[in-house]
């Protein structure tokens, strides 16, 4: 009988990550239906990036989708940003494994600057959807031949609808009203907490003048505006 040396034994473990988005009004996992791209970042105990991977497209909508990750056994700080692509309204810096730190992984909302004297920062288009997920200490072990860990996601973006309607039925002229929202919420840290940022002014990306029956789009007595 032959005895295999320790170096000849296959002790490899397959690690996979499942992303779950059920923090919504339906309390159902909507990841496969809503998320089109997802990036996972893994940091070591010193906050140094050791691994990152992005997957996108139809594969995310497949039943039972999980992301295969090539990590050594150990403890990792996992961070996920989802919804980022070339057309996204948000961006994160390029980071490099072995060099970049956790604090560098900030997410910034795109904005325009007005020609006014104060150079106001403006957001006047519909925001693309953005999700964030984090597991501060996830252990990957050799206890089994495979391991699946879950990263829960929260959605950062929302749509605000403002409806202005005259009670006496008199037509509301859409061009006579302007709605804006101001906030300094355009810069998020790796843990999804807001960082200090300039004030942003949000303008409606969609305006409609409709009837008193809000199920119609005919001219009438109500104005409907959407802001992201």
Q: Which residues are covered by each model-predicted region?
A:
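Short, low-hydrophobicity acidic/polar segments
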Residues: 49-155
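Bacterial Sec-dependent N-terminal signal peptides
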Residues: 1-21
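N-terminal low-complexity, intrinsically disordered tails enriched in Ser/Pro/Gly
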Residues: 2-7, 26-32, 54
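Residue-level recognition of well-ordered beta-strand positions that form the cores
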Residues: 18-22, 41, 81, 163-165, ...
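Acidic, serine/threonine- and glycine-rich low-complexity intrinsically disordered segments
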Residues: 112-226
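Short, solvent-exposed beta-strand/turn "edge" segments of beta-rich domains on protein surfaces
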Residues: 6-9, 29, 150-155
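Structural motif
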Residues: 21-33, 163-172
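Tryptophan-paired
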Residues: 38-93, 172-228
């Amino acid at each position: 009988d032959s005895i295999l040396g320790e170096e000849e034994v296959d002790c490899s473990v397959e690690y996979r990550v499942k992303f779950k988005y059920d923090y919504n009004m339906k309390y159902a996992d909507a990841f496969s239906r809503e998320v089109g791209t997802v990036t996972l970042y893994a940091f070591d105990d010193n906050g140094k990036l050791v691994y990152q991977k992005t997957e996108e497209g139809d594969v995310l909508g497949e039943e039972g989708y999980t992301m295969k990750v090539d990590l050594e056994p150990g403890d990792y700080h996992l961070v996920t940003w989802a919804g980022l692509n070339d057309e996204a309204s948000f961006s994160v810096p390029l980071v490099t494994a072995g060099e970049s730190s956790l604090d560098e992984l900030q997410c910034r909302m795109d904005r325009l600057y007005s020609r006014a004297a104060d150079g106001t920062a403006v957001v006047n288009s519909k925001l693309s959807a953005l999700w964030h997920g984090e597991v501060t200490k996830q252990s990957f072990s050799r206890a089994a031949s495979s391991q699946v860990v879950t990263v829960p996601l929260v959605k950062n973006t929302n749509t605000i609808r403002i409806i202005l309607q005259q009670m006496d039925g008199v037509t509301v002229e859409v061009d006579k009203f302007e709605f804006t929202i101001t906030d300094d919420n355009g810069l998020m840290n790796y843990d999804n907490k807001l960082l200090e940022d300039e004030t942003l002014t949000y303008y409606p990306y969609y305006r409609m003048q409709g009837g008193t029956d809000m199920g119609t789009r005919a001219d009438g007595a109500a104005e409907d505006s959407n802001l992201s």
